Amino acid sequence: ALPRSTAEVSTLVTACAQARVGIVPFGGGTGLVGGQVAEDGPKPLILSLEKMNAVREVYAEENVLIAEAGVILADVQAAADAQNRLFPLSLAAEGSARIGGNLATNAGGTSVLRYGNTRDLCLGLEAVMPSGEILNGLSRLRKNNTGYDLRHLLIGSEGTLGIITAAALKLSPKPAKIGTAMLVVESPKAALSLLSLARDQLGEMVSGFELMHKQGIDFLTQYMPEVRQPFDAAPEWTVLIEVVSPAAMNTQSALETLF
């Protein structure tokens, strides 16, 4: 099924509930753990949100963007960028993963240290519950203590508690400067010590910290030989760190404090 609106999703869910037919929500199909694969038994309805792909509104002054569940993550990023804002969720499949799937799996991405998981980037949700009832929870408020906060049950539930149809997403100011560095470390324990040092000295400037093993670098060299490697031979353990700052800060000088 390819619904184009929340009302159509509600109609489909209501009909399936009455007929006792299961539903498998489908986003961009980028998950690699089989979450979008139906179990053996009676065939369920595959419900794709790909036609619900509108960015409904961007409230630049509030740092909020309202997107339907079928919007591709890269399109959310582009809509924010057009307003000189940042939607900081970034991952390898951002060109095909959809925001509903990101929310349903509580995706982390590369900037989770600074901005948090997808859960931390969501202010409100619109969803269709198993009965077909529509949950209208597209709040744009940072501070909202009215009633039960059902979005946190739905985020990460992989469609088992309801089908997310739209979300109010939290935007951030775009960093003026971004600095990156690649460092060789002796072990994962040494990487943790480096991360602790970086956060002690640079605080919220640390936006990314990835520990890579030699095997991963070797795979990259084997399958993408055109990618230039920073080392003649890959070290056993490597850390890639990213820091961001406002215009007044120098990211290179900040990174040099770690050496």
Protein language model features and the residues they cover:
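Noncatalytic alpha-helical scaffold of FAD-dependent oxidoreductases
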Residues: A1-F259
